[in-house]
Amino acid sequence: MHTIEQIFINGEFVTPHGTEWFDLYNPATARVIGQVRLADEDDAERAIAAAKAAFPAWSQTTKQERIAALKRMHVAVAARHDDLLEAVIEEYGAPASRSAWMASYPAEVIAQAIEALEAFAFVTPAGAATVQMTPLGVAGLITPWNSDAGFICGKLAAALAAGCTAVIKPSEMSALQTQIVTEALRDAALPPGVFNIVTGRGETVGETISRHPDVAKISFTGSTNTGKAILRNAAESFKRVTLELGGKSPTILLDDVDVAQAIPLVIQAGFMNSGQACVAGTRILVPLARKAEIETALAQAVAAVKSGDPRDSVTEIGPMVSEKQWLRVQGYIRKGIEEGARLLAGGEGRPDGTRDGWFVRPTLFADVNNRMTIARDEIFGPVLCVIPYQDEAEVIAIANDTEYGLSAMVLGGDADRARRVAQQIVSGRVLVNTLAHEPKAPFGGFKHSGVGREMGEWGIRAFMEPRSVLG
């Protein structure tokens, strides 16, 4: 059993004022594997005060001093790779291929921030003026459970690169990852108060951070509903806000697509992170003339996807992170059937060979129209919908007929045509005949998928304001 009973404030591990204990589960077994003591409002206040006190000195550090600090962070986090790998499997249930990436990503994203900082121009000319990019102040960083260690390191690295100090509220469901990352960051020997990590509930710690007048910036990744609440809270003191929220991403198969080449990309995009990904391509838009062919190929591919023990090398989809999430996904599968969608693969219940744990059968629906609940709501599980279209104009209309706009993918034989379609999709990122990631490019969403951008120089700039100096 793991017991985590301290938070990190002003350069040291301290016992929280909060007294609530939160059970940690292994989602592959549904058994309790530990407990974490949660911080409360008083702890959040102490962390904010520490970050505020550290800001004047940190904001005056040079670029080279910040690069040196980030390099120490990178070395310290990279050294804990194996510990992170075990934690990701144990408390999150990520299968082997995904957990390996999740354990490497925290160090990788710090390295990416170092590269962005090295190229970042803090002072630029603008006619007769000089524009100075200045750090905002204390940044509140609120991270989700589906890749918590990576989000902690990515947001913190960008904030520190900009000259901000930080208070981090990680997900209480990811306490093992958080503990490992916190220990690593402590070992990087950053000045006290520059970063503070307080694990607690959103309605206490998160609420305090998003309302506090001494917090100048909020960076949040999570659900759209929580993002709306944070935006309302932040408006009281005109905080700058970056929100990376939900998605219902379309994967468009054009009528000239090579189906054999496309299907593996469709499956990877739809089932990434066991379907628990904001960018997952869960609406599969297919040409009516090739609907039967594509449905058959997809049904075979989905039926072949292995869901089960994350420690088994053949497993491609692990469990949902919690019983609550499992019940949510089961409810959406049931809703799809009730609304008239046709099951091509999967369905309610657990996959064959699994008894315990929060496993979901990889599920594929056909005969879906874009007004159905399963085509509108972000399910956050391994559930895909096939939606037919008549022509190019209709597929663009269907793709954009959503409150979200985070990611999309276009697959087609004519690359120029595919890019032309991509340019008409209302989305922060559109992939054309690839499933790739570019850390130098801005990442974020349109519409209800968020506000602002992260990654690369965009991520650093999000923690700063321009000051114009003349004369």
How would you label these PLM feature ranges?
Residues 29-35, 215, 252, 306, ...:
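Conserved C-terminal structural/oligomerization subdomain of aldehyde/semialdehyde dehydrogenase
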Residues 30, 66, 88, 163, ...:
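Residue-level signal for inorganic ion chemistry
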